[in-house]
């Protein structure tokens, strides 16, 4: 395996599959099976999950909600996804802990950096829910922050496209895929792969970002192996 400690960023939409809303149990099971293969190879894996399949703070704000309130609702959506993911992982025999940035002791541990790292060292998967606990920050930024905190070697951004393009491949047939690109190129060209705060955090801490297609079976293992299946930002 190319990497020994990995932060996997899963969008909420990844858990939705073909559904218009919510969580597709079959997709969760497929992701869990891929993750189990990674853990079997003694890779320490932490996961940050988004909430866009249930509620997106920015959209709530655009629809008239107070932005901070909308973001807090979005944070709760990420916890719902984290618990669902934990259930899927434990069904395939992967010991999993959920840690949340906002305390909810009846259903998850509070986020404690040292405890999270100890879980990883013991071979458990740690799923981070609740974003970073503050409004106005995306779950991509949370992924970059947690990766830096737990000393992850890479951020794996699992998404619905197979890499980073110079324009939307779903809209433009001549869209060019990058096999690799720099943090600065992403920032200066305003390439919409992650928000600028997340990119800058990874840049400042020398954490590469691998962007790949989550819906292709086995891609998580391939990405962790270092296979060139997506786009590498470094």
Swiss-Prot record:
Inhibited by UTP. It comes from the Bacteria. The keyword Nucleotide-binding applies. It catalyses: UMP + ATP = UDP + ADP. Its main location: cytoplasm. GO terms for molecular function: ATP binding; UMP kinase activity. InterPro entries: AceGlu_kinase-like_sf, Asp/Glu/Uridylate_kinase, Uridylate_kinase, Uridylate_kinase_bac. It holds the Pfam family AA_kinase. UMP binds at residues 51, 71, 132-139. Pathway: Pyrimidine metabolism; CTP biosynthesis via de novo pathway; UDP from UMP (UMPK route): step 1/1. Disulfide bonds: none annotated. ATP binds at residues 9-12, 52, 56, 159, 165, 168. GO terms for cellular component: cytoplasm. It is an enzyme of class 2 (transferase). It is found in: Cytoplasm. Catalyzes the reversible phosphorylation of UMP to UDP. Belongs to the UMP kinase family. This is Uridylate kinase. The gene is pyrH.
